A protein has these predicted regions:
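Extracellular glycan-modifying ectodomains
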Residues: 1-194
Length: 194
């Protein structure tokens, strides 16, 4: 299996690294993707690392990069490599790919680099699923989403996708958010203790 963090922040990459299943770097490892990631995949990550400031055209905030003018070219090259690596995996792997997204939480609505309107995590994951199945029909994958924002989602609702998407999308509700990484470990990563 190949595990690919797709946001919202660096917690997923930290979790995978801590449990020795983060074997390579990907575009969303150490940044904040306020408005989801599906548009990046849809556009083959075009202009992903072109910076006018610390947030790109996809509303991805680069918290750790693009701070020092002396190394900006190095940061651009690093993200270009990560994007190319991800696209190559999507095009060529025979392994199952597990995309993991920790959904946004209430504070993301008011962070200074965030947008007033944050993408609906479920809709973005559905859009990503449609992109993946059309662009990479041979790809075996699962998208795992943990909902976290109590302003956008209710603890009283069980969120599911359409029946034809359920094989590829796994949504964990807001009431399970505190146990999201334990769920990932128990369901998708074997022999790991949290």
């Amino acid at each position: 299996m190949i595990y690919i963090p797709i946001g919202i922040d660096c917690d997923v990459a930290k979790f995978l690294k801590r449990h020795n299943v983060r074997n390579m770097a990907f575009p969303f490892d150490w940044n904040v993707s306020y408005n989801g990631v599906s548009k990046c995949f849809e556009n083959n990550f075009a202009n992903f690392s072109e910076q006018s400031n610390k947030i790109n055209k996809y509303d991805v905030y680069f918290h750790h990069d693009f701070q020092n003018n002396a190394i900006i070219n190095s940061d651009i090259e690093k993200y270009n490599r990560r994007c190319e690596r991800l696209i190559n995996i999507l095009e060529t792997t025979n392994d199952t790919v597990i995309f993991i997204r920790k959904g946004h939480i209430s504070r993301h609505h008011i962070e200074p680099y965030g947008k007033d309107k944050i993408a609906n995590d479920i809709e973005d994951v559905k859009h990503l699923h449609n992109i993946l199945k059309n662009k990479y029909p041979q790809l075996k994958y699962k998208i795992v989403l943990g909902l976290g924002c109590d302003m956008c989602f209710s603890k009283d609702i069980i969120y599911k996708c359409d029946s034809d998407d359920n094989d590829n999308i796994d949504i964990q509700g807001i009431d399970e958010f505190s146990n999201f990484f334990e769920y990932i470990s128990n369901t998708y990563i074997t022999n790991i203790n949290i």
